Amino acid sequence: MPNNLPDEGNPVAQQTDNRPPALKPALDSMTLLVAAVIVHDKTTNRVVLLQRSENAKFAQGMWDLPVGKSEPGEPITETAVRELYEETGLTVKPESLKVAHVIHGAWGVEAPNGFLTVVFAAEEWTGEPENREPRKHAQVRWVDTELFPTSA
C-alpha cells in the first residue's frame, strides 16, 4: 500500500465564487405587529367599518377594520384599544377583547420584512363611532353583516 496519497496535505475543499452569500443577521424587527378590532353589535348584527380615504397610503376607497401598528414594547391588546379609540372614538377594555383571527403576511406596504396582525372581537364598548382621522378615512359607519360576501 503506498504511503503517499496524491495531493496529500493539500486542502480538498476550495472556496468558489458561485457560492451564495451568507445571510446577514437580522438587526431590525423581522415582523411588524398590528392589531385590528371587530366591534360587533350582536343585537343589530352590525360591525364598525372605516372607508379608507383617497389620501390613504394604500387601499384607497376600500373598507377596513379599525387597525394600526403596535408601538415598541406595547402589549398587542393595548395597541387594539389605542387604535380603536384613535380612529373611531370607541372605548374597549383590554380584558374584553377576544382573539378572532391571526394573519401572517410575508410582505406589507409598511412591512417589507413581514407582518403579524392579531384581529380581536369586541362585543362590549362605550361611545358612538366617529371619524377621528379624516385624512386617513373618508367615513366610519355601522355596516350590516348581511351585506358581507359569504365566500371568497
Give the predicted meaning of each segment.
Residues 36, 46, 139:
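Conserved beta-strand and immediately adjacent loop positions that scaffold enzyme active sites
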Residues 2-36:
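Acidic, metal-coordinating catalytic segment for phosphate/diphosphate chemistry
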Residues 32, 60-65, 94-96, 113-117, ...:
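Short connector loops at helix/strand junctions that flank enzyme active sites
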Residues 119-121, 130-152:
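NUDIX/MutT-family hydrolases
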Residues 91-101:
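A short coil-to-beta-strand element that immediately follows conserved catalytic motifs
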Residues 45-86:
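Conserved Nudix-box catalytic region and its N-terminal flanking loop in Nudix hydrolases
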Residues 43-45, 101-129, 141:
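Active-site-adjacent beta-strand/loop module that shapes the phosphate/pyrophosphate-binding cleft
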